[in-house]
């Protein structure tokens, strides 16, 4: 039986591997496994909670250097007096705000997710980009199309 969704997922996974975006490729392969096994009953839960769980894991990864002591408190405090660090803080606030808009947009208009994913994979493959941007990209899209 022909399954166009499975074909699209396989093509996106292949693009992920071709562009050395293993995070995207592995994620898609996991979803393919879920789709073709009895685990597919978990899709409603994955759709509802997946983004939240991903953000929690990402936040743990970002905060780990502070929690482990690799990033000393003195360095953290110094970031409030150095002008480059203040710019980094401002950009971090802006990007976090964009990411929040992106989550809202992706939740309200899931049809954009495929375009964001393809754009991210193409950016990695063609322009030596880094695959960090679907939420931020969605936030930028929300600015262009006027959605909050």
Swiss-Prot record:
Cited InterPro entries: UPF0756_TM (IPR007382)
Keyword Cell membrane: yes
Keyword RNA-binding: no
Subcellular location field: Cell membrane
Matches recorded under Pfam families: DUF441 (PF04284)
UniProt membrane topology term: Multi-pass membrane protein
GO CC terms: plasma membrane
Transmembrane segments: 14-34, 51-71, 86-106, 121-141
Keywords linked to the UniProt accession: Cell membrane, Membrane, Transmembrane, Transmembrane helix
Major subcellular site: membrane
Annotated family: Belongs to the UPF0756 family.
Name of this chain's protein: UPF0756 membrane protein Ent638_1667
Top-level taxonomy: Bacteria, Pseudomonadati, Pseudomonadota, Gammaproteobacteria, Enterobacterales
């Amino acid at each position: 039986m022909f399954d166009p969704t499975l074909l699209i997922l396989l093509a996106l996974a292949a693009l992920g591997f071709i562009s050395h975006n293993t995070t995207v490729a592995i994620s898609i392969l996991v979803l393919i496994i879920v789709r073709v096994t009895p685990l597919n009953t978990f899709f409603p839960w994955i759709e509802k909670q997946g983004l939240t769980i991903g953000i929690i894991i990402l936040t743990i990864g970002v905060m780990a250097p502070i929690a482990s002591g690799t990033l000393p408190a003195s360095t953290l405090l110094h970031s409030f007096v150095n002008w480059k660090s203040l710019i980094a803080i401002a950009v971090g606030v802006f990007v976090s705000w964009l990411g929040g808009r992106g989550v809202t947009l992706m939740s309200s208009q899931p049809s954009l997710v495929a375009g964001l994913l393809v754009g991210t994979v193409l950016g990695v493959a063609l322009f030596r980009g880094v695959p960090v941007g679907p939420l931020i990209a969605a936030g930028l899209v929300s600015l262009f199309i006027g959605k909050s």
